C-alpha cells in the first residue's frame, strides 16, 4: 500500500484531473498499446504495466474503491488529451464547414458500421491523424461479463473513431486534395492505419 501512495504522489502533479482525482494510466499489453503508451508519455504521463493475470478488472475496481481520489484508466480508452480530463481545449484550424466535409469523407470510409462513433476533435498537430479508442466503462463491463461467462454477442465491440482536425494530414493534405476519389481513398487509408494501430 505504501508503494501505491508513493506512486500517487509521484504522478499527482501531471495526472490529476479537473475533479481532483489522480488518474493512474495503465496497460495490460505493452506490445499492443505501444503507440498509445508513447502518446501518453509524450504528454508527460506515466503508464503502469499490469501484465499479470491477477491484475484484472475486479482488482482494478477494488483498488479504486480502496484508494481515495484515484481512478484507473487504460491507456487506449481515449485520446491522450482526454485520458486525464482537464479544462484545456484547443481550437480547430478547420472551419465548421471544412470539418463537416472531412466528417463526410470518414463516414464513407467507415461505411455502415454501427459499432463505431465518429468524433471530430481539435487535438495537438503532433497527435495521430485518426485514433480508435475503446471507452473504459464499456470495455470493463465486457471484461467482467466475459469472466462471469455471460453471453456478450448482443453488445458488440463498440469503439470511437477520433479525427484530429489539427493534424497536417487532415487539415492540409486531405482538405487540399482536388479529386473526390483521392480524398475518399486517403480518408480510408488514415482510418485503416488507425485500425492497424488497434490490431483490428
Model regions: which residues?
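Long, intrinsically disordered, charge-dense linkers/tails
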Residues: 1-200
